[in-house]
């Protein structure tokens, strides 16, 4: 008989992350694809990128945002399918309804990820472990799986959710946060990208435990005021509140722009830059469950001035193949041969919201 854990004290924050969500929905609708490498993101012969893939495909090295040609080389036997985003929104809405049934505090991060406040006695009637297990079982009954991490704050919950994927459940009970975090690499904590990780490595800081013990003055000299915040998070001491759906604000636009180290003068180079920026916007739209109806193209020139052009689409979309093609048509209106382009940007707005959307436009992993 298992040992009964002590009563949970303090906040209990969970992070529910649907496992390889787009691929899981495709396999739900096509049972014959289960157990086989599956790639969502168009055609193997296209010049696009992988949106997501099944865990079977990941064993061959395929991952999100990988060029389709490289994915085909790594896994030639994979099944390819275009995304069916209306269907993904439908299943996501069912999952979010389960979360809302368990707690009034649900903060949707993306179409396949949400924070939940399951603090016992405040927003949930039972120990967080029981609530998380019930959520996992209810989601699995829909035909997809999720991984859940629970801890005292968002940082701990997020890291915990990634420890045992897919279909995992990791609980970090109060008082055990530092022991759980100490041996993990600094890259396990969100907000530490490649640049920050490299700077920490130069300081011989490789783990969250080492980060938590670093002198405040040393971190401040490298990262400024963010250094102490990083150290507090590495100690598991972050204070973070889950914001309910009713309190979320709507995103007005999703855009991406780039300033070039050297001015672009050839139309082909400008088109390639716009296409690359558009792929990023498309991924962010899909992660946030947004479809936009207005395309905006922005250029700035070497002599300081700039121009923008907009066009409204007949139907909202999150497909970069559609809105990038429109942006390239708009290029004729604001660029002429001989112009030196210093900056290019592309954006989508006028959203058809698929449920409550959080304003934080973050990349997420499956």
What are the residue ranges of the model-derived segments?
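Residue-level detector of conserved catalytic or cofactor/ligand-binding positions
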Residues: 360-366
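Short Gly/Ser/Thr- and Asp/Glu-enriched loop/turn motifs at secondary-structure junctions
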Residues: 109-113, 151-154, 290-294, 339-343
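DNA-contacting surface of Y-family translesion DNA polymerases
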Residues: 2-7, 188, 196, 201-341, ...
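Non-catalytic surface loops within mature trypsin-like serine protease
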Residues: 20, 120, 152, 301, ...
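Gly/Gly-Pro- and Ser/Thr-rich, intrinsically disordered tail segments characteristic of DNA damage-repair
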Residues: 1-232, 283, 365
